[in-house]
Swiss-Prot record:
Gene3D superfamilies: Cadherins. CDD domains: Cadherin_repeat. It holds the Pfam family Cadherin_2. Residues 909-923 have a biased composition (Basic and acidic residues). The gene is PCDHA6. The lineage of its organism: Eukaryota, Metazoa, Chordata, Craniata, Vertebrata. Potential calcium-dependent cell-adhesion protein. May be involved in the establishment and maintenance of specific neuronal connections in the brain. Residues 1-29 form the signal peptide. This is Protocadherin alpha-6. Residues 799-894 are annotated as: 4 X 4 AA repeats of P-X-X-P. One of its GO terms (cellular component) is extracellular region. It comes from Homo sapiens. PROSITE patterns: CADHERIN_1 (PS00232), CADHERIN_2 (PS50268).
Length: 950
């Protein structure tokens, strides 16, 4: 059979009415249950399966289910036992509100066949809601003038329950003024009100606090409470009142205008405008009262508005009204009696006359400064006046007669300590209480020229480089004068003196106002190393006062002098030195010596010598000592050497920049028989050396004796002149001379007599002779002792090997014509803050560069005008404690003495040792080496041909 879609739709439409008809027949029955609200979960409601006639076994197969229009989760059926129970909390007020009937409608549906059952579950009300007022507190405003039995409506409470649970009864807390009025209106609701039982008085009780309680009819009873705040409103039923009906006030006659006489205070028990009080004079008050007094309407303060006078009126009677601002206004009254008291109302008067200002600081004690008069208009004790002065001042008051005083000087004045005094004169009368008056007086102290200008320190040390531009500023002196005005106006001037043959003002100028010191011309260190002078500072007072300050201007050396070659011993062409040298001369022999001097000092005068060898010669046979200038052979001369050599020696100082000079030495190689000088050098150490030196030593002895005699005569003459000459300002002191020594490492030590007189500007410079003190322990050198005197002694006093040859420099003669000064040696040490020049040192461990060459100078600047030691090769030995250092300097002469200790096995040649007036003739020894080696000789000191330079 084939069905079309239209056939299927027709059959479905026919089946639906049949099902609805069957369901209507089955569900025609209805069940009713009841359950209290707020029942717990699982509370039994009813056996719904049994009541519907269903078997428990068919509940699940027939798909037993339950539906509700309300919340479906409130009730549930247990399919195992068919019991309907409470599934969740049921709140009747939430479910049905305030409705009298409240039920839950359920539809129970089962299939096979389809059946629908209607079940109504009634929710019973329980008393679970207390009465509630709309607010926690109610405010009630009542005027105190309301009559008793007046009713004021109140807001009632409400209860969410129904039935007897919502029936409310009200109760008011106990009060003598209020009761509760309850009425039932047309809709059976209770209308409550507050009943006034007794008249109110705001001044006694401005507010009342009541409690209204509502109770429902449930079991158990539930209550609700609201607080009633009753505020009593004021009415103007009280007049202002004063504490007293009459007040008495005493006031002095000299009270100022605006002085408070009394402050009245009236009170009104009312509030607001009813209690606001204004004060005023009564209409019956006399005009005299209004002229002398006034009253503040708001505060009730009575003040003085006119001058009171005890002699005119001593009592005032004032009527006062206090009125509130109520309706109608009410007033209170009082009387104020003002009694005027007599008073010491006249302050002493002070008059200053005959002022003698300012006061000289040298004024005598008792000098009258001012006259003071006092006056008091009062009489009796009120008119008796005493005067006093500011304490701790050098003045006092002296009473001349009644009410007249003199201000006089009581102690010495010092304007520099206190330039002005502010005095306060106090006049006090004898009243009770007493009155006083003060007068200020400014006393200035006139300055007197009692303070000389003072410098910060008595001596200044200034360092100026030589060759300064003319007029350059070198220093500024400043003196302070404690005085004032013209007495403190300081002017500066130079204390004139002679500097050698010239006036000090030709060197130095001082600006009179600023104190700036200027060098008027370039200073020359070689001419003037120290310029010591004084600057005077004087004020403009009458008479003027002054003081001096000493300035020590040290002229610092600059390298402005190039080395100068000394005149050659034998004239040659073009200024060159010609030397004849035998070809048989061995290696290391001195053939010539270049001598040069440098007028500078320190490093600027430290000379070094360099030989410029020709470019064509690979084995040049000559060399020059770096610091000695001695030209010696480097090897044995042979026939291959050129017969003539032109040697160019470059002499250079150590300044910045270095300055140089060039010396030319012409060396001619000749046979031994053709050169006497060369043969004499070559014959040193031959069979008869003593015979070759006999004639030379004779001349040396004669020359030394002559020089010694001249020295003794000079010393005697100088001593006589110094003893007979009167002392002059700035003369040199006769302190012990200073011997300056260098230690083994080149440091300098000085004797206790640190400074000698530096005669810069004290007569002709460099004219004093300095003797060397032999008592100085650091430098145990004894001049003028006998032969074989050991110059170097150690702590054990063991004899040491004699010194090598001493050679008397040819240029020392120039130094003998001048005095020996510390400043000439370049080692001057000034006073506080003065210079301390230290020169480069050479360690005793430094290996010597070549034979016969003097090591670099240790100490001051060096030139050939010096004592010179000549020695053979070998390293210097460091001296032990108490021994004489390797090098020392004779102060006052640009000289260096080098003492070298030869090795034990070294060959030593000895020459003459020249001292001041004594001579030790040493012998020369010769040692020959085996083989065909050339015999080497080491010469200490100058050759005998050099004695002519002495």
């Amino acid at each position: 059979m084939v069905f079309t879609p239209e056939d299927r739709l027709g059959k479905q439409c026919l089946l639906l009415p049949l099902l609805l008809l069957a369901a209507w027949k089955v569900g025609s029955g209805q069940l009713h249950y009841s359950v209290p609200e707020e029942a717990k979960h699982g509370t039994f409601v009813g056996r719904i399966a049994q009541d519907l006639g269903l078997e428990l076994a068919e509940l699940v197969p027939r798909l037993f289910r339950m539906a509700s229009k309300d919340r479906e989760d409130l009730l549930e059926v247990n399919l195992q036992n068919g019991i309907l129970f409470v599934n969740s909390r049921i709140d009747r007020e939430e479910l049905c509100g305030r409705s009298a009937e409240c039920s839950i409608h359920l539809e129970v549906i089962v299939d096979r066949p389809l059946q629908v059952f209607h079940v109504d579950v009634e929710v019973r009300d329980i008393n679970d809601n207390p009465p509630l007022f709309p607010v926690e507190e109610q405010r009630v405003l009542i005027y105190e003038s309301r009559l008793p039995d007046s009713v004021f409506p109140l807001e009632g409470a409400s209860d969410a329950d129904v039935g007897s649970n919502s029936i409310l009864t009200y109760k008011l807390s106990s009060s003598e003024y209020f009761g509760l009025d309850v009425k039932i209106n047309s809709d059976d609701n209770k209308q409550i009100g507050l009943l006034l039982k007794k008249s109110l008085d705001r001044e006694e009780a401005p507010a009342h606090n009541l409690f209204l309680t509502a109770t429902d009819g449930g079991k158990p009873e539930l209550t609700g409470t609201v607080q009633l705040l009753v505020t009593v409103l004021d009415v103007n039923d009280n007049a202002p009142t004063f504490e007293q009906s009459e007040y008495e006030v005493r006031i002095f006659e000299n009270a100022d205008n605006g002085t408070t006489v009394i402050r009245l205070n009236a009170s009104d028990r009312d509030e607001g405008a009813n209690g606001a009080i204004s004060y005023s004079f009564n209409s019956l008050v006399a005009a005299m009262v209004i002229d002398h007094f006034s009253i503040d309407r708001n505060t009730g303060e009575i003040v003085i508005r006119g001058n009171l006078d005890f002699e005119q009126e001593n009592l005032y009677k004032i009527l006062i009204d206090a009125t509130d601002k109520g309706h109608p206004p009410m007033a209170g009254h009082c009387t104020v009696l003002v009694r005027i008291l007599d008073k010491n109302d006249n302050v002493p008067e002070i008059a200053l006359t005959s002022l003698s200002l300012p006061v000289r600081e040298d004024a005598q004690f008792g000098t009258v400064i001012a006259l003071i008069s006092v006056n008091d208009l009062d009489s009796g004790a009120n008119g008796q006046v005493n005067c006093s002065l500011t304490p701790h001042v050098p003045f006092k008051l002296v009473s001349t007669f009644k009410n007249y005083y003199s201000l006089v000087l009581d102690s010495a004045l010092d304007r520099e300590s206190v330039s002005a005094y502010e005095l306060v004169v106090t006049a006090r009368d004898g009243g009770s209480p007493s009155l006083w008056a003060t007068a200020s007086l400014s006393v200035e102290v006139a300055d007197m020229n009692d303070n000389a200008p003072a410098f910060a320190q008595p001596e200044y040390t200034v360092f100026v480089k030589e060759n300064n531009p003319p007029g350059c500023h070198i220093f500024t002196v400043s003196a302070r004068d404690a005085d004032a005005q013209e007495n403190a106006l300081v002017s500066y001037s130079l204390v004139e003196r002679r500097v050698g043959e010239r006036a000090l003002s030709s060197y130095i100028s001082v600006h009179a106002e600023s104190g700036k010191v200027y060098a008027l011309q370039p200073l020359d260190h070689e001419e003037l190393e120290l310029l010591q002078f004084q600057v005077s500072a004087r004020d403009a007072g009458v008479p003027p006062l002054g003081s001096n300050v000493t300035l020590q201007v040290f002229v610092l050396d600059e390298n402005d002098n190039a080395p100068a070659l000394l005149a050659p011993r034998v004239g040659g062409t073009g200024g060159a030195v010609s030397e004849l040298v035998p070809r048989s001369l061995g290696a290391g022999q001195v053939v010539a010596k270049v001598r040069a001097v440098d007028a500078d000092s320190g490093y600027n005068a430290w000379l070094s010598y360099e030989l410029q060898p020709p470019a064509s010669s690979a084995r040049f046979p000559f060399r020059v000592g770096l610091y000695t200038g001695e030209i010696s052979t480097t090897r044995v001369l042979d026939e291959a050497d050129s017969p003539r050599h032109r040697l160019l020696v470059l002499v250079k100082d150590h300044g910045e920049p270095a300055l140089t000079a060039t010396a030319t030495v012409l060396v001619s190689l000749v046979e031994s028989g053709q050169a006497p000088k060369a043969s004499s050098r070559a014959s040193v150490g031959a069979a008869g050396p003593e015979a070759a030196l006999v004639d030379v030593n004779v001349y040396l002895i004669i020359a030394i004796c002559a020089v010694s005699s001249l020295l003794v005569l000079t010393l005697l003459l100088y001593t006589a002149l110094r003893c007979s000459a009167p002392p002059t300002e700035g003369a040199c002191t006769a302190d012990k001379p200073t011997l300056v020594c260098s230690s083994a490492v080149g440091s300098w030590s000085y004797s206790q007599q640190r400074r000698q007189r530096v005669c810069s500007g004290e007569g002709p410079p460099k004219m004093d002779l300095m003797a060397f003190s032999p008592s100085l322990s650091p430098c145990p050198i004894m001049m003028g002792k006998a032969e074989n005197q050991d110059l170097n002694e150690d702590h054990d006093a063991k004899p040491r090997q004699p010194n090598p040859d001493w050679r008397y420099s040819a240029s020392l003669r120039a130094g003998m014509h001048s005095s020996v000064h510390l400043e000439e040696a370049g080692i001057l040490r000034a006073g506080p803050g003065g210079p301390d020049q230290q020169w480069p040192t050479v360690s005793s461990a430094t290996p010597e560069p070549e034979a016969g060459e003097v090591s670099p100078p240790v100490g001051a600047g060096v030139n050939s005008n010096s004592w010179t030691f000549k020695y053979g090769p070998g390293n210097p030995k460091q001296s032990g404690p108490g021994e004489l250092p390797d090098k020392f300097i004779i102060p006052g002469s640009p000289a260096i003495i080098s003492i070298r200790q030869e090795p034990t096995n070294s060959q030593i040649d000895k020459s003459d040792f020249i001292t001041f007036g004594k001579k030790e003739e040493t012998k020369k020894k010769k040692k020959k080496k085996k083989g065909n080696k050339t015999q080497e000789k080491k010469e200490k000191g100058n050759s005998t041909t050099d004695n002519s330079d002495q």
